Amino acid sequence: MNKWTKSAMLSVLAVVILLTTTSCSTSNTAGSTRNVVATGKYALYTKPRTVKGAKLVASKSMMKKFASYTQSDADYYYGRLRNLAYKGSAYYFHVYGYKVTHTGSIYYHVVTMNGNYRGYVYGGKKVGSFAGGVKKATTTQPTTIPADFMNYVGIAIPGTVWNYPPYTQYKTKRLGKVNWTIPSLAKFKVTKAVKRTREQDTYFYLKSQKSSVPSGWVNFRYVLHYSEIEGNEGIIHN
C-alpha cells in the first residue's frame, strides 16, 4: 500500500467517523416536556451540522428572533390580536427526536409549533437536558376560573374551539367554529383556564354538554354566560 492510498483511506475513515450518528426517538415522553425555545446561539440545519450535506434552515439571527418575546411584543398582540412576523407561540419549538454524533454532541430534531421550520439544532451533551441552541419552554401558565363562569356558558360568534390553546403544543388545530360547524346555542361548562406565556391571553377549556359538539379551548373574549347567548339566540362578537 503506497502512502497516497493509505492517506486516502484514512481520509475516508475520518469522514465516516465524523458522520456517524445514533438515531433515537423521544416520542415516549409527554409532549409538554419536549417544548423548547431557541436561544439564538446556534443555527438550525437540515441535518446535524457536522454531517455532510447539512443545509441551513434558519440562521442564528433568525433563531434569535424566534427566541425573543418582549412586553412590547405582547402589547402589539393585545392591540391587534396578531403577532409581529416570526414572533409568538407559533415560534416555540417541539422536540420529536435527536441524534448523537461520535463526539457525544446532541442534535435535537425540532419543528416550530406552526410547522414552518423544521431541522436539527445543537442541544448540548446530555440527552433530555436542553442546552446549546434550545432551552425548556413553559408555553402556558395555569390561572383561576372566574367565579361568575361556574355555571353554563356559550361561545359568541365567530369563536373557535381548539384542541390546545393556539400553538402552545405542536399540531394545534381548530375543532370547530361557532355558527359554522358548532351551533350558536351550544352549551358548555368551563373546567380549566390557562394563560399563554407569550401573548398573555386567557383560554378556557369548555366541556361540551352535547356529544355532537366538540369540547376544547376557546379564547376568553368569546366565552359568555349562557343566559346572554340564549337570550339573543347567539351573539356576534366584533
Can you say where each PLM-predicted feature lies in the sequence?
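Generic "edge-of-domain/loop-turn" microfeature
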Residues: 14, 49-51, 100, 115-117, ...
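Boundary regions of SH3-family modules and the immediately adjacent low-complexity/disordered segments
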Residues: 111-148, 207-238
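Beta-loop motif signature
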Residues: 26-102, 130-203, 231-238
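Sec-dependent N-terminal signal peptides of Gram-positive bacterial secreted proteins and lipoproteins
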Residues: 1-27
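Homeobox/homeodomain signature
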Residues: 8-9, 14, 32-35, 46, ...
